[in-house]
A protein has these predicted regions:
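Non-ligating segments of multi-cofactor redox enzymes
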Residues: 1-177
Length: 177
């Protein structure tokens, strides 16, 4: 599994040849990972859509599913992304896991569930249609500029939050579908 944590990689992607075109993160990822393994799978460009969250949890048991349905890391919170899976012919032994309890278990307030302006996270699901519809309105501009308000409300790893150009790029990509 290959991914990134926090916003630091954005300046690298933005300065790369892919940084000025459409889908810079996906194109940069494909270029950088090409040739590192016998094959590479990506979480974008499907179908087929591969079970990246399941693979990530197997590789790193400290990852847990947050109330928002995305993986939370005990140090980086919701501010990490899975970019690719490297496939090798030979079996590679993983280092011993460092399982830790999910930080969500001890979070009584669950601000992530209360902060979404359209209540898109409820009943154990995510109302993607309501979220995207809201983003297309003037009221949705704070989310488009600052990033997902529910993710920003999570106290875990807040210092690693995506900000500025990266947050805006990711929100535009999500809003487009």
């Amino acid at each position: 599994m290959v991914g990134n944590v926090g916003p630091g990689f954005w300046s690298i992607v933005h300065a790369s040849p892919e940084g000025k075109g459409a889908d810079p993160i996906n194109r940069w990822t494909a270029r950088v990972l090409a040739g590192l393994a016998d094959a590479v799978l990506f979480p974008f460009g499907g179908p087929p859509h591969h079970p990246f969250q399941r693979w990530a949890r197997r590789a790193d048991p400290s990852l847990a599913v947050s109330p928002l349905g995305i993986l939370i890391h005990p140090a980086f919170g919701l501010w990490h992304a899975l970019r690719g899976a490297l496939l090798f012919r030979d079996y590679l032994e993983l280092p011993p896991a460092d399982p830790r309890p999910s930080p969500c278990e001890s979070c009584a307030a669950k601000p992530c569930l209360r902060t979404c302006p359209v209540g898109a996270f409820k009943d154990g699901g995510y109302d993607v249609v309501s979220c995207r519809s809201y983003l297309a309105t003037l009221s949705g501009q704070p989310c488009m500029i600052q990033g997902c308000q529910a993710r920003l409300a999570c106290p875990v790893g807040r210092e690693h939050a995506y900000r500025g150009g990266l947050a805006q790029h990711l929100m535009r990509a999500f809003a487009r579908g």
